[in-house]
């Protein structure tokens, strides 16, 4: 993905508004998919490819991919979320398939797809190996699986940071996390603390080491592998903005605009968190140490033969 797109006004607005409503979240998903498309195009022909999206949720990403020419089948266990996706696809005038199903028991014949998308999904399934094994079965030879997930021991990998922005808080005993969330009365758009806990409770504690082992056992080779830090959304925008502003020739007005935006977006707490995560960032290049520093892993798995 192009980090420069983090500064795109439409993307920033979609990101900031993503919890306002179901429709806003679908639009955010579409914006994320548009960012991902150039990367995906490096590994398979996105024109008319047969693509399965596992864990599609409300379907926004699949809609954007279908608009780009992919033949998308969106699958999820959440029937209500799929219903939102069906309605959104109809409003967008997009032809795509929605199907309720389990990633560990895919209802497709062998070699049915050219690519599979597991975007922020594999950390929630009961058996990651079973899902990867099924993906291998339904892929054509040479097909790829695009995977993104936050390793469980990363600083903000608990899916609760919309409410609790404390590094590694999710590693505390589950009843403490639950009590803290349930004590909060505020909600963020459609997201409540109880719903955030429900998402947290699905996490399978997937690690980088555990994912690699499961992928190899399923038969895949690695076509792309990257472990990255996550420095908070304001922090990522600050870094990308500074790099852009300081490129030759550096422009003082661009630098000033970046700093003004950062001052508006950061609180004292989030800026201190940004400094802590920045200090940890080099650890993502060190095996084993990366487990406690990573914000996310982006992988492309390939089926050979």
Question: What kind of region is each of these model predictions?
Answer:
Residues 1-105, 115, 292-304:
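Conserved N-terminal segment of class I S-adenosyl-L-methionine
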Residues 49, 110-112, 142-143:
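Surface-exposed loop/turn positions
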Residues 125-126, 139-140:
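Helix-to-beta-strand junctions that scaffold the AdoMet/dcAdoMet cofactor pocket
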Residues 129-130, 134, 144-302:
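S-adenosyl-L-methionine-dependent methyltransferase catalytic module, highlighting the catalytic core
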Residues 63-66, 132-136:
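A structural alpha-helix within SAM-dependent methyltransferase catalytic domains
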Residues 45-46, 110, 132:
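A short, aliphatic-rich alpha-helical micro-motif
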Residues 118-121:
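A short beta-strand submotif of the Rossmann-like class I SAM-dependent methyltransferase core
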